[in-house]
């Protein structure tokens, strides 16, 4: 399985990253990508930008640990997680989670699992910049609830259908 985990300030090309994952591969039958963008509005307030901070070293290690958990749960052939940090303007890409498998079910489930983890447990902190000033963003109850569905015993890995 190919795995790419990157934390970076620079923007990245989502299509190029997906193409890199599948280049020369004939065993991949499904690729699921999730791309998170900086919205221009937060609770009715126009957003100029977000500033994302992370714990260097720990963030990469924690993401890698959850990628390994996803591999144990689903028959994955590739995973890419790229997360930006620093100041990110409205409309810019923040995060990419891409998963590849022989079949779509595993790719969809793994991408959802990894994104739920990134939203709730990864060591990132988000500050929003609006015309009213800046404020740190608290975790959302809905994100925690979404992540809870993965806390039970994972289903037995099924052979490719």
Describe these PLM feature segments.
Residues 94-101:
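Short glycine-rich or small-residue beta-strand-to-loop segments that form or flank ligand, phosphate
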Residues 1-94, 108-112, 116-161:
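N-terminal, polar/charged subdomain of small-to-medium soluble alpha/beta proteins
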């Amino acid at each position: 399985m190919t795995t790419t985990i990157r934390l970076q300030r620079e923007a990245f090309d989502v299509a190029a990253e997906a193409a890199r994952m599948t280049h020369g591969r004939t065993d991949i039958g499904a690729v699921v990508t999730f791309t998170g963008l900086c919205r221009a509005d937060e609770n009715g307030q126009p957003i100029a930008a977000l500033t994302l901070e992370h714990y260097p070293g720990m963030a990469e290690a924690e993401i890698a640990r959850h990628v390994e958990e996803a591999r144990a749960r689903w028959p994955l052939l590739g995973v890419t997680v790229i997360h930006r940090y620093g100041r990110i303007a409205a409309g810019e890409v923040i995060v990419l989670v891409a998963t590849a498998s022989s079949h779509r079910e595993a790719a969809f489930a793994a991408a959802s699992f990894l994104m739920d983890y990134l939203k709730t447990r990864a060591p990132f902190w988000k500050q929003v910049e609006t015309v009213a000033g800046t404020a740190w963003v608290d975790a959302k109850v809905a994100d925690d609830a979404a992540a809870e569905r993965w806390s039970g015993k994972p289903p037995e890995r099924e052979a490719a259908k």
